[in-house]
């Protein structure tokens, strides 16, 4: 049998199922999105009693009396508390730290840092 040019036929078969509903789309599931506040950038804030150890109008935590001596492994901080009797021992300390405390002299008076506007008795 010979084909005639320019003619063609096509058959499409479509099967439709009726009576069965499509499977449910898990209607019980829900999604909860919680918004969280952005983390604030960490800032250092100095309290009014923070030492200005350079007397330049800046606050600093570099005061020599804050330093803690390294301890042997396993040594508790309470074992070395008696060592604080010597004071800070720093040659750069201008606040007069010693076993009597910040700026205290033997006579009971206090030392005045040079830039604080106090008078020098010498």
Swiss-Prot record:
One Gene Ontology cellular component: nucleus
Modified residues (Phosphothreonine): 20
Region: Disordered, residue numbers: 1-33, 72-122
Compositional bias per record (Low complexity), positions renumbered to this chain: 111-122
Start and end residues of each stretch annotated as Atypical RING finger domain 2: 88-97
Residue stretches of biased makeup (Polar residues): 1-12
UniProt keyword Phosphoprotein, yes or no: yes
One Pfam family, short name: PPI_Ypi1
GO biological process: defense response to Gram-positive bacterium; negative regulation of cytokine production; protein ubiquitination; ubiquitin-dependent protein catabolic process
Single GO MF annotation: ubiquitin protein ligase activity
Enzyme class, broadest EC rank: transferase
Alphabetical keyword list: Phosphoprotein, Protein phosphatase inhibitor, Transferase, Ubl conjugation pathway
Signal sequence range: none
EC number: 2.3.2.27
Coiled-coil features, chain-numbered ranges: none
Region of interest: Atypical RING finger domain 1: 55-65
Domain of life assignment: Eukaryota
The UniProt record lists the keyword Phosphoprotein: yes
Substrates-to-products reaction catalysed: S-ubiquitinyl-[E2 ubiquitin-conjugating enzyme]-L-cysteine + [acceptor protein]-L-lysine = [E2 ubiquitin-conjugating enzyme]-L-cysteine + N(6)-ubiquitinyl-[acceptor protein]-L-lysine
Ranges of biased composition (kind: Acidic residues): 78-87
Function: Atypical E3 ubiquitin-protein ligase which ubiquitinates TLR2 at 'Lys-754' leading to its degradation by the proteasome. Inhibitor of protein phosphatase 1.
PANTHER family, per the entry: E3 UBIQUITIN-PROTEIN LIGASE PPP1R11, E3 UBIQUITIN-PROTEIN LIGASE PPP1R11-RELATED
Descriptive protein name: E3 ubiquitin-protein ligase PPP1R11
Organism the protein comes from: Danio rerio
